[in-house]
Amino acid sequence: MSDAPAVGAFPQTPVAARRGPARPSDSTTSTTIKRTSPLPLAPQAGRQATNISPVIPLHILDAPTQRFYAFAFYLALTAWKLYDWTQVLEEDTESFLLFLKWIAIDCVFLFGLPELRIPWLELSQPFVMVAFAIHAMFDWILMFNIGFPWQSWVIGLLKVFYDREIAISEHNVKLSSILQNSSLIMGRQIINILPEGSAILNPELQPFCLGGDRKTANIPIFFNSTIPVEVELIRTDFETGQQESIKLSKSQLRDIERRAKRESQDGDTVQSIVQFDFPVKKTGAYRLGRVLDEYKLEVQRRNPLTFVVSCPKAWVGPALSAHRCVGDLSDLSMMVEGTPPLKIKYSRMINGKDHSFHFQSLQPEGFVSPLSGLRSNNWGYDEDDISWARAQKVPVGLNESMHSSGDWQYSIDEVQDGFGNIIKYDSLADDPDGKPKPKHLTQSFVVKKRPVIRLEGCDLRHPLKVAKGKSKNLPVSYGLSGGSREDSTYQIAWQFSPIDTLTESGDHGDVVTIGTYTAKNNRDRPTISAPGLYTLKSVSASQCEGEIQEPSSCLLLNPLEPRLSLRHEEIPDTCAGNSIGLRVDLDLIGTPPFIVRYDVISNGERRSERVSIPGLRYQLDLVPRIAGHHKYIFTHVGDSIYDGQKLSGPEYVLEQDVKPAAAALIQHSTGKMSSCLGDQVTVDILLLGDPPFTLEWELIHDGKRKQFKVPNIQENSYQIKTAPLTTGGEYTLGLTSVQDKRGCRNFLQEELKISVRRQSPRAAFGQVDGKRKILAVEGSSVKLPLRLTGEGPWKVYYANLHDGSPDKPKVQEKIIKSDNGFLEVRGRGAFAITDVWDSQCHGVVDPKASRFDVDWFPRPELSVALTHGVSKTETGFQLQDVCEGDVSGFEVALKGTPPFTVEYEVRHHPLQGSSSLSKKKIEGVVGKEAIQADTSKAGTYTYKFTALEDDLYSSNRGFQPIIVKQNVNRKPTASFVKPGQTFKYCKSEQDNEDGIPITLTGVPPFFLEVEIKHQSAAVPEIYRTPAIDSHSYELKIPRHHLRLGTQHIRIRDIRDGSGCHSTSGILSGPSVQVQLFEAPTIYPLETRTDYCVGERISYTLSGQAPFEVWYTFNGVELKAKSPNTNFRRIAESPGEFTITSVSDKASECRAPVSITKTIHPLPAVRISKGKSVRVDIHEGGEVDILFEFFGTPPFEFTYTRSTNARKGQKSQVLETRHDISHEHSKVIKASQEGTYEVVAIKDKYCSFSTQAVVGLEGGKKDKTKKLKVY
């Protein structure tokens, strides 16, 4: 028999024994295959027969039959699997048990099939593994009800073989045989909720300002998921409060639309945030008004005010003059304009060195603004009154002493308003290559040194002597303060009194004239010629008044012309012997030294001689060397002022033909002495010879001689005591002659020059800034300027009239070495000069300038302003208690010399833990400063002001710390003890029912506010608890605040006994769920009692599945089980159908009911004219859904809302609703997204439902909501 199978037959089953080559007898009918190169036969020794046979022998069941049975068994398993899948679809659920079941069955089948060793089904192990994985995946898709693309085709194919449901009689009936009429229910309404659109103006509340270079301000408007077609802004004017409506132009709206489409990820739906910068050119408060989207619906918007204010600016007020002198005040004002409180930064550059200063919290007196941080609420303001945002002008005065010369420049660098708008003006120090600042931002001064003038080489003791008719420069020494001697022009003025009008004390008399002179340079001097007293009164240079230093007075004298008188006698060799020469007495009038010229003619020879005479008297011994006739002719006499005056007359000619004694000496080493005005002079005289002596002497003053003779002097020493010298000037005391016992009178030439002061030493206080009063920093030494005349050093006696007894103040002595010296004192009071001595004479004190008042600059003072919320306590001040995070503060008043520097400590004592300390410093120039209180953490804050400095005082001596305290209460908190837990309650309240436990922190009593959000409600409901007196509480919400189903409970607000509260933003946290159940009941999805044959009678069960339902049909009582909340039966025959009772798993009770249905013939309904209509709305909008009924009213219908089908996704049924209409049409308003379709319709007698079809064609179902079927 041939081994080749017949055509069309199964291949021949291989036999294990037939492994070797075919024998010739076995292949007689086979086709011979010719080989060009036949293979050699395998060795016989290598042949081994294998014994592999099927488990079921082939002689019992051949191989094809075994393969057929295996394939049939696989098809049966597949059909069973598809049946289980249809049950999953019918129940719209998932089954993990079915998945495990089919995983096990497929595993046994696939791994057991190869073990049967059926020919051609001997599957390899890898193939079985891959096949099992594919089956497991297929089981997962089916049993977990996961949609797949060809699912509907499979369902349709299955419906051909299986389309049966349970009827009222509890038998399966084929639905398609009863109901196959899709035209009865037509149409659907698709509502698409557009993304929630919103618009917000300036969400970050950025500050904007207009002014200067900022002509426009671009305010950002953010549009979220919307394309606006109309945008309106409301502008409120700061000045008038009137509102103005501004609308975006069409071009601007088109720009927004282009941006939205460019940013959108979906071409049909806007999902992005679009920013549009709206330019404004007017100041005011802006907010969004009306915003409409492309569907003419109003877009949700937030309306915070955006303030566009005038940009802050500052300028320097005009100064009367750009010139200043050292010691002058700057007298400068700056004006700051903007929305208070303002800040300004300015720099002061002195000779290229920069100094920066800050002024803060600048605002008008009494100005109140929410920007000042002095309110206790969270930056609240009245939108009806925004006048505080208008620009205000605040002057800032600078009045500081300009202590150094050079170029001073004040420059404004930066200004900032209360909203944080900053205008910077670049300074030359920051940008040397930049443009200079405008003139209104700077003020430059040229501070010049003050001139200093004094007389040099002339005073009352050393007058100027000038010949009559001649002039001389007033010896002015000119310079500038600081010791420099810059060349400059200057003007001086002086007082002049003629010499004959001076008082006895040498001061100016009644006749006083004023002289002025403008010097071209510092070497130029005025010329004077009139004799008298010159006293400097003022000096000025470059518009700066200068200082007059001592000596300031000069006396100009015209001395007498020199005159000479001669007396002569012969010189005997003994008291009474022959003459050996002439002794000539020269008596001179004039100003020594003198030069006397004479000619000598001896024995016919003539020669000229010259003698220098230092005084007014001189004895010239003319002793010729040779005997004879000698003639002496005196020709000229001159002094230090006048040149030689010619002498003529016989009295100046002496002739002689040529033939010791008593003496007297003046006991003085130098021959010169000084005396005080009005004092007596005592001169010691040494007499030589034999007493008794007769002494002749004379006193010469001002050209007048007064001779004296003292006889009978018995001692060899004698004191000449003059009368008081009441007239100042030069006196000459000369000894004229002396005679001793022998009677010989001898001529004497001894002289003593006595210089008598023309004025007594004088002491007075100088002036500081034109007055004898000064303010100084407390504790510092003060140098009081003195003006002294006389010969130094001086002893100045002074007293502080405020020190000691008023009648006898304590007198102190001070030695002053300079006539323009200083009296250094270290206390304050009224200092008076009581007496003065110079190096020789007692002086006088100028009564008009004998007193100088010294007082301290007031030390800076700090006090806390007792405004609202600030109270005085024994230890300091107490601020009103605030809550954690609130804004609070207080004001401090400052007195002194600005700018001020205040240092203070902030110590925080928390409710628990250790305290913390921080140090802060503020600088200010105005009299009030706002201190921002720290309320970031709960506890007690202590503000201790430890140091206060102003422009004068940098020490804290005498400053008493000020303490301000404030209690910051912690914000209360509330939280669920079991967050995230679900609490189940029945609709009717039960006894001993547990509440929702809540833990609270804070100060009792508490007032709690919770938010109840039902999943089907658009707006949450608010429930407020009564007062809670403990920190733990069980929340029991009344039933009228709850709805059936699940609701989320969230704590929204809590307020405690201290007045503090926390909002949802702070209390955001886990919520709890509350599920409210009713007792198990059953409700018909339709209220009608008449049905038509072929309809499903559907009920909704409330409670917890599974349910048991008892009912009667045509007098027969039946019991049915429902694994879910849906209970339905097919009305396959007419009759009375009555539900008698129902029970569920949760209640475990049987609730009696009586629901009777009468089965009757099918109504029709069309939704949206029988078409599929799509409408796009915004959330919160509504759509009218039109239902048209055909049948006998009234109509009851059930419709579903499903998710809208999207590409690659199946829609899900979200909810099922039923309604009633007594007309042939009905409009229902819908606001939720989804596809609305009628699944059941009922008229007066009949009803029709397509839910079974929907359930099979709707794709993937919602796993949380059971589909309600009829």
UniProtKB/Swiss-Prot annotation:
GO terms for molecular function: structural constituent of nuclear pore. The chain crosses the membrane at residues 68-88, 96-116, 127-147. It is a multi-pass membrane protein. Its main location: nucleus. Residues 1-67, 117-126 are cytoplasmic. Keywords: Membrane, mRNA transport, Nuclear pore complex, Nucleus, Protein transport, Repeat, Translocation, Transmembrane, Transmembrane helix, Transport. Residues 1-45 are annotated as: Disordered. GO terms for biological process: mRNA transport; nuclear pore organization; protein import into nucleus. A motif (Nuclear localization signal) lies at residues 756-763. Component of the nuclear pore complex (NPC). NPC constitutes the exclusive means of nucleocytoplasmic transport. NPCs allow the passive diffusion of ions and small molecules and the active, nuclear transport receptor-mediated bidirectional transport of macromolecules such as proteins, RNAs, ribonucleoparticles (RNPs), and ribosomal subunits across the nuclear envelope. Due to its 8-fold rotational symmetry, all subunits are present with 8 copies or multiples thereof. This is Nucleoporin POM152. The lineage of its organism: Eukaryota, Fungi, Dikarya, Ascomycota, Pezizomycotina.
